[in-house]
Regions:
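Metal-centered catalytic cores of metalloenzymes
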Residues: 1-78
Length: 78
């Protein structure tokens, strides 16, 4: 298991996401951003918009995805 923070994934805070794969932490980040914005946390709004943009434009979003996967792979196990 490895840990990445919201900030490491492009968000504004240091909330830790844990997972066995990069996809696990990316999914946790997506849920965190949606929850934070739903609770009127304006600081997370730009990151949520960026995330939605990656889903709407998957080819251009692949650069972010590949970087997140590389960053995750480089992390030590918890």
């Amino acid at each position: 298991m490895k840990t990445m923070t919201c900030k490491q994934l492009g968000g504004p805070c240091d909330l830790a996401h844990h997972g066995d794969t990069a996809d696990d932490v990316i999914k946790a980040q997506d849920a965190h951003l949606r929850d934070a914005v739903a609770q009127a946390d304006a600081a997370h709004d730009p990151a949520l918009k960026d995330m939605k943009g990656r889903w709407k434009h998957p080819i251009s979003g692949m650069g972010w995805y590949r970087k997140a996967k590389r960053d995750f792979a480089a992390l030590p196990e918890d």
